[in-house]
Amino acid sequence: MSEVTNNPTHNRLLAKLRAMGPYLRDPQSKEGLYYFDCLSVCIDDRKSPELREFWGWWMELEATEGGFTANYHIGKYDVEGNWLDLAIPKNALEEVNKTQNCFHLKLVKTLEENFQLSVAYHEQSVEFV
């Protein structure tokens, strides 16, 4: 039986967040504030990989008393590697919502089972349907 702690160290938390998959962006993360993103839908897969842009989501996970708040955004990941807060076309929106929902469920489960910490949506977070 694994030990559950609700006061994890930064490194223990990072290890669990990394194990969730390729979402965590270490260089943009710091203790108490973690950055995630997902390139859900390629805009034009005929372009060479280094020139591709994507529709997707990004999120800042901020530590709070007893848990975290998740502030999700949706938009376009451009060729320069920047997220742009743009409306996603309907033909890509379903997949973006699906990847975000799957990730969020995994995040909530990971933090609850390992650390007894909750995750709430930030008041400015994009709603996924």
Swiss-Prot record:
Q: What is its main location?
A: cytoplasm
Q: Identify the stretch(es) annotated as Essential for activity.
A: 99-119
InterPro entries from the UniProt entry:
Tscrpt_reg_Crl (IPR009986), Tscrpt_reg_Crl_sf (IPR038208)
Keyword entries, A-Z: Activator, Cytoplasm, Transcription, Transcription regulation
Q: Where is the signal peptide?
A: none
Which NCBIfam families does the entry mention?
PRK10984.1
State its role: Binds to the sigma-S subunit of RNA polymerase, activating expression of sigma-S-regulated genes. Stimulates RNA polymerase holoenzyme formation and may bind to several other sigma factors, such as sigma-70 and sigma-32.
Q: What is this protein called?
A: Sigma factor-binding protein Crl
Q: Species name for this entry?
A: Vibrio vulnificus (strain YJ016)
